[in-house]
From Swiss-Prot:
Co-factor requirement: Ca(2+)
Gene Ontology annotations of biological process type: arachidonate secretion; lipid catabolic process; negative regulation of T cell proliferation; phospholipid metabolic process
Keyword Disulfide bond: yes
UniProt organism field: Bothrops ammodytoides (Yararanata)
Enzyme nomenclature, EC number: 3.1.1.4
Matches recorded under InterPro entries: PLipase_A2 (IPR001211), PLipase_A2_Asp_AS (IPR033112), PLipase_A2_dom (IPR016090), PLipase_A2_dom_sf (IPR036444), PLipase_A2_His_AS (IPR033113)
Tissue specificity remark: Expressed by the venom gland.
Binding sites annotated in the UniProt record for Ca(2+): Y27, G29, G31, D48
Descriptive protein name: Acidic phospholipase A2
Post-translational modification: Contains 7 disulfide bonds.
Catalytic site positions: H47, D89
Disulfide bond annotation, renumbered to this chain: C26-C115, C28-C44, C43-C95, C49-C122, C50-C88, C57-C81, C75-C86
PANTHER family cross-referenced by the UniProt entry: PHOSPHOLIPASE A2 FAMILY MEMBER, PHOSPHOLIPASE A2, MEMBRANE ASSOCIATED
Amino acid sequence: HLMQFETLIKKIAGRSGVWFYGFYGCYCGSGGRGKPKDATDRCCFVHDCCYGKVTGCDPKMDFYTYSEENGVVVCGGDDPCKKQICECDRVAATCFRDNKTYDNNKYWFYPAKNCQEESEPC
């Protein structure tokens, strides 16, 4: 669920997902096309691809189960589809933490007209 994704971003990356990643580059936020502009935008591209591979549940609307063990987020639950959503979100939040290029604010509120290149395959 997108609200859980926001929570994981805060837990793992230590930042608000909506504020820092909701309107960034060509892939962070709604939609996505063109080539990722930097490492942070690539995190969003990979997350979009991950959601695109989920079948049998809705990555944006379905809630999943996770826990924290020694400060590490662990995806759980019996539903493999929902666990896959959790893994997509966990990996993206970790990617945001490890690639803090969002400080390059030339990509904040980046115009979609600058994202016209052919998209890379997932």
